[in-house]
Amino acid sequence: MENIDFATLFQGIGTMMASGWVLASARVFLVLLGLLLIYLGWKGMLEPMVMIPMGLGMVAINCGTLIMPDGTLGNLFLDPMLSDTDQLMNTMQIDFLQPVYTLTFSNGLIACFVFMGIGTLLDVGFLLQKPFASIFLALCAELGTFLTVPIASALGLTLKESASVAMVGGADGPMVLFTSLALAKHLFVPITVVAYLYLGLTYGGYPYLVKLLVPKRFRAIKMVTKKAPKNYDAKVKLAFSAVLCAILCFLFPVASPLFFSLFLGVAVRESGMKHIYDFVSGPLLYGSTFMLGVLLGVLCDAHLLLDPKILKLLVLGIVALLLSGIGGIIGGYIMYIIKRGNYNPVIGIAAVSCVPTTAKVAQKIVSKDNPDSFVLGDALGANISGVITSAIITGIYITIIPYL
């Protein structure tokens, strides 16, 4: 008993003192950051379904470090670095989140589940009503996804790392996770955390960007519709989804799990399977998103901050989202010119594929300047196109980048 000291008895404190001031400072910072995320999630400033479990995971993993039997520092949550099969099987019986991580996270399954749920939210009828405008705006809103690659390469990142962080500009968390797992697995944790942190800020940040770049007289434009938009029945939407899924899987088989998951969600929505729809759009989507937040949180141990690339990723993430927002607004102005003034440029911001947040942002801004202007239908069309376009770019990057 006399050999048991305070540091041995309370190993969280003991490992803090034994790990050196740099690692200890990083652990303290991440604990404070986790508490901040919990607070911001509770206040509704960030997405609570992701940020609260992520923040609590950060707190627990950095407080719950202990000394393992071999003398190294570890935890009882999970070990993402395991590759030996026997060691992995042993750890899965000890670390309670290791089975969840190994069987759903590291293979992209959880990202596909989230994407399947997103598919149930998409009414492709809005895209079919104005396909040219929707697709054009979506392409413009990928400006950050394209331009961030050379910027990141200039800052010293490899091409695979650059493409992974550039996908933050697509404003779709599962897409970022899927791409980084395929191209830069050693950086998928910081890249995905950066993506979800910044995506939570789009609802609060993009309105300022729109107001900066779009004068009030343009924001207040009320679009005149000469004829009522055509309503497509479920049969057409289902056929469209099936054909597009087949084409995209044929062209980019490496990203076919994403395409399949997205359009399966759309098919469930349009096929009238109410009980399956309720499951996929509810428990599956929200449960997967919640567990994604949990896993991202417990993966944020102190070594994350010690990676010299983390600062670059933080900067590049915000640059990618900023450029994508600017690109979408530029596309809105081009459509304004093409339509000879009968188009509201604010719709361009909705092409950034954070479903349905950016579409709501567009309508909220427009309604504030002109309560009689309704752009939500056009905004949702651009929004849905943005999701599909981001998935296509993911397929292009994963297919082409390894050969460059």
Go through the PLM ranges and name each one.
Residues 1-22, 28, 75-93, 208-239, ...:
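Intrinsically disordered, low-complexity non-transmembrane regions of multi-pass membrane transporters
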Residues 24, 124-149, 196, 303-329, ...:
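Entry/N-cap segments of selected transmembrane alpha helices
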Residues 37, 102-128, 266-268, 285-307:
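Hydrophobic transmembrane alpha-helices of secondary-active transporters
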Residues 43-51, 99-101, 122-135, 274-283, ...:
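Interfacial helix-loop-helix linkers and transmembrane-helix boundary segments
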Residues 103-108, 116-121, 135-147, 151, ...:
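Alpha-helical membrane segments and immediately flanking helix-loop junctions
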Residues 187-204, 316-327, 347-350:
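Alpha-helical transmembrane segments
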Residues 195-273:
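Membrane-embedded hairpin module used as a gating/binding unit in multi-pass transport
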Residues 243-331:
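Transmembrane helical segments that form the transport core of multi-pass membrane transport proteins
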